[in-house]
């Protein structure tokens, strides 16, 4: 309901098709983050002026204030942003080719091409430098208008490669912003996340281990303190003995 009224579901999905629901409980998470910021600002103001204040938080208002350039497109450019799958909306001044998600041999890879230099490197990578000076592709808008054909060319280049092979070659050799799309099992095992210790493995006993997320930051003097709630009846005897 909050995503509907806040204007987000209208933007999510394929062009010409029904809106799609976002996974998880995004309004709850986002409102909690904004509430944390509001509380810290209020505490800072209390320390500065000695005056407290009453805070109001709304999931709906949180979503409505997160639209950024979507609102600018509507009110300044007169362009109503709409569902456009994994690409920029062509009617927008932000339109460009290269922000797209394409299939490869073992899943999907996301490209974030947005500048002229990146476009030229993409053309060189797929062996189509002739496109750089082609009048049909010499502006961002023209490339966006021909995105289906360009998707076909890039897909031919990546089709037989794995996500990791594409990620390494595009980022390390060509300096292009790309990323493999990972599922949660892959995220939990990711070497970078494990090195940064943002996940916590909790032993449940009986050889059962569950992984929890911790915090998206690392503080030099703080470590997450995560534990389990008591099991059923775990403290019953101690409680009755003292009461």
Which functions belong to the PLM regions below?
Residues 116-117, 186, 217, 224:
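Short, glycine-/Ser/Thr-/acidic-enriched flexible segments
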Residues 172-193:
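Conserved PLP cofactor-binding pocket of PLP-dependent enzymes
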Residues 170-171, 193, 219, 240:
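Hydrophobic, well-ordered secondary-structure elements that form the walls
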Residues 163-164, 184, 236-237:
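Residues at or immediately preceding the N-termini of alpha-helices
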Residues 2-168, 197-207:
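Acidic, glycine-rich segments within the central catalytic cores of soluble metabolic enzymes
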Residues 61, 182, 220:
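Residues at the C-termini of beta-strands that transition into short coil/loop
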Residues 203-243:
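Flexible, small-/acidic-enriched active-site or ligand-binding loops
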Residues 126-127, 174, 243:
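A broad structural signal for alpha-helix termini and local helix breaks/kinks
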């Amino acid at each position: 309901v909050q995503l509907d009224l806040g204007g987000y579901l209208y933007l999510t999905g394929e062009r010409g098709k029904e809106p799609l629901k976002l996974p998880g409980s995004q309004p709850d998470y986002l409102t909690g983050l904004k509430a944390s910021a509001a509380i810290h600002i209020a505490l800072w103001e209390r320390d500065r002026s000695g005056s407290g204040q009453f805070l109001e938080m709304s999931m709906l208002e949180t979503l409505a204030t997160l639209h950024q350039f979507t609102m600018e497109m509507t009110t300044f450019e007169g362009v109503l942003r709409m569902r456009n799958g994994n690409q920029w909306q062509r009617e927008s001044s932000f339109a460009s080719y290269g922000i797209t998600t394409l299939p490869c041999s073992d899943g999907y890879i996301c490209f974030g091409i947005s500048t002229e230099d990146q476009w030229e490197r993409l053309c060189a990578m797929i062996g189509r430098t002739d496109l750089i000076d082609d009048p049909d592709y010499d502006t961002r808008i023209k490339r966006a208008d021909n995105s289906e054909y360009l998707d076909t060319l890039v897909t031919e280049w990546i089709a037989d490669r794995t996500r990791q092979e594409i990620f390494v070659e595009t980022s390390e050799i060509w300096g292009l912003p790309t990323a493999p799309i990972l599922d949660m099992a892959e995220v939990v095992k990711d070497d970078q996340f494990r090195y940064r210790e943002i996940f916590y493995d909790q032993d449940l006993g009986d050889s059962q281990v569950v992984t929890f997320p911790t915090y998206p930051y690392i503080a030099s003097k703080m470590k997450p303190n995560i534990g389990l709630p008591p099991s059923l009846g775990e403290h019953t005897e101690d409680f009755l003995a003292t009461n």
